[in-house]
Amino acid sequence: MIEIRNCEFVTITGPDTKAFLQGQVTCDIEKLSKNKALAGAICNLKGRVIADFLLVLDGEDVVLRTQSGMAEIIKKTLTKYAIFSKVELSIETRFTKVLGAMADEDEAFLTKITEKLPKGALDCHISTQAILVRIPGSDKRLEVWIHDEKRFDDWGINHNFDTEEGWDKKDIMQGFIHISPQLSEEHTPQALNYDLAGKIDFSKGCYTGQEIIARMHYRGSAKKRLSLLLSKSLIKQDSEVIQRHGEKTSLSKVLTFSNSYNESENSALLSILDIASEEASFSLSSQTDEEQNLDLQSLSYPSLMIGK
């Protein structure tokens, strides 16, 4: 199991919670239930992604899980629109530990929390001990939000967990990118593949940024997309991706990466690139190293609830 530290939580309470969120997020809140979580995003008026999240319905409250540094940004953003709604937003602190688990490898631990594991993408289970959410993708991952880590002794679990680098790489290999404060309001959902990953419901009503996001979707194919590339070399903080196609050369930022120190495995990165033809080539550039070749990989997203 992996300890996930790069996360924060916001709780939204009050009689208008669902109606309020429906006008602020890209997913359809009507599809949120005690057994089904939602993945989505909050956007600004220009259609740029402020934050992404997982939503869980816990009783009458909605719990929003996001990246470190984003909870206060989300609270501040949503509070601006909550003036005329009966809702309260607060930073959630009750989850003392968040774990990443594999459904098969960690089944013995997981069944101590619940007899019935979430099976489908975004299925969830809520108990007095923890919240379990099945992460979309082919690798059968679950997030476990623990209320009280003192129960570890009762469950026969030690406190020595793997670091989250491996978990982050699984996200990268699936083509999932999460918004940090550095990426907030920089990119459209389409450029981040959020439409392909099921984070945008095009059949729901209006929400902040919806008009621009829908126009981009119905206008036709995207010119740029989040892309997965593999490297035999280590990726650095200042690394950039060089894309060459004929006489055209473009430079793109590395949005997130995970290095491998095992010779049998490649390092991996995500970057927003021009839609490539078969003739395009890619390389990694940094201020201190020579260019290194990159291999473009195809991405296949799980089919969730993408409205047409």
Residue ranges of predicted features:
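Basic, glycine/lysine-rich polyanion-binding surfaces/domains
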Residues: 1-308
